[in-house]
Amino acid sequence: MPSISTNITLAFITALLGMLIFRSHLMSSLLCLEGMMLSMFILSTLTILSLHFTTSFMMPILLLVFAACEAAVGLALLVTVSNTYGLDYIQNLNLLQC
C-alpha cells in the first residue's frame, strides 16, 4: 500500500510540474489539471478505504463532481478562446479582461 500511495503522489507532482512547464497552452494546462484531480481522487479513495473512515465515503464522489464541473468550464473556455482568437495560448486570456 505505501508504494501505491508513493506512485500516486508522484503522479500528482508530475502533473503539477507539467502544469508549470506547459503553462503557455490552455489545452495542456487542462490536461495537467485533470491528471491532478485523478490522482487526488485515487489517493483520497485509498486513504478512506485503508483507514476505514465510514463517515467520509462521499468525499471522492464529491471530488469527481467538482472535477467534472472544472473540465466542462475549462473546455467551454477553450472552445470560446480558440473560436475567437484561433489559438489556445494563455496570453490571449489577458485580452478577455474588461
Curated annotation (Swiss-Prot):
Q: Which residues, if any, are the signal sequence?
A: none
**Domain of life, per the record?**
Eukaryota
- Which keywords appear in this protein's UniProt record, sorted alphabetically? Electron transport, Membrane, Mitochondrion, Mitochondrion inner membrane, NAD, Respiratory chain, Translocase, Transmembrane, Transmembrane helix, Transport, Ubiquinone
Question: GO molecular function, one example?
Answer: NADH dehydrogenase (ubiquinone) activity
What gene is this protein a product of? MT-ND4L
> What's the protein name?
NADH-ubiquinone oxidoreductase chain 4L
Q: What class of enzyme is it?
A: translocase
- Residues annotated as coiled-coil are none
Give me the segments passing through the membrane.
2-22, 29-49, 61-81
